[in-house]
Amino acid sequence: MSQVILDLQLACEDNSGLPEESQFQTWLNAVIPQFQEESEVTIRVVDTAESHSLNLTYRGKDKPTNVLSFPFEVPPGMEMSLLGDLVICRQVVEKEAQEQGKPLEAHWAHMVVHGSLHLLGYDHIEDDEAEEMEALETEIMLALGYEDPYIAEKE
């Protein structure tokens, strides 16, 4: 049976009201075992300052963002199950959910699904890549019991 090992790091000034570790595990389990047998993923939940700093350093964007994905590149000849790290900004996720009229839990789930697909090599730079990735995200979110996260864009 496929297994995803979660290393959850809560690095917010206030960690109250965040999803439970079991929820993060459920969301990861809905994505990663479809693509590989055994994986280890770190999810770090941060405040805006850390998200802003990482986004500026690694993407050249001078603002915080919802989720950053850092895939782990295994050196040639080595076998490791470490897939990578997700850094999710609490305040951005909460603000986006409110602005988009989405349930907060569903938006958290979407950020984990979206980021996990990036760790697995999916991207949305080109239109055809975006369509494939969004279709997978929608399929996974529906399987988890949430609405299509892109429903507003399709209407």
Curated annotation (Swiss-Prot):
One of its GO terms (biological process) is translation. Keywords: Cytoplasm, Endonuclease, Hydrolase, Metal-binding, Nuclease, Ribosome biogenesis, rRNA processing, Zinc. PROSITE patterns: UPF0054. It is found in: Cytoplasm. Gene3D superfamilies: Metalloproteases ('zincins'), catalytic domain. One of its GO terms (cellular component) is cytoplasm. The keyword Nuclease applies. Disruption phenotype: Mutants show defects in 16S rRNA maturation, ribosome activity, translational fidelity, and ribosome assembly. They have severe growth defect at high temperatures, essentially no thermotolerance at lethal temperatures. They also show a decrease in polysomes and a large increase in both free 50S and free 30S ribosomal subunits relative to 70S ribosomes. Changing R59 to A/E: Loss of activity. Single strand-specific metallo-endoribonuclease involved in late-stage 70S ribosome quality control and in maturation of the 3' terminus of the 16S rRNA. Acts together with the RNase R to eliminate defective 70S ribosomes, but not properly matured 70S ribosomes or individual subunits, by a process mediated specifically by the 30S ribosomal subunit. Involved in the processing of 16S, 23S and 5S rRNAs, with a particularly strong effect on maturation at both the 5'- and 3'-ends of 16S rRNA as well as maturation of the 5'-end of 23S and 5S rRNAs. This is Endoribonuclease YbeY. It comes from Escherichia coli (strain K12). The lineage of its organism: Bacteria, Pseudomonadati, Pseudomonadota, Gammaproteobacteria, Enterobacterales. The gene is ybeY.
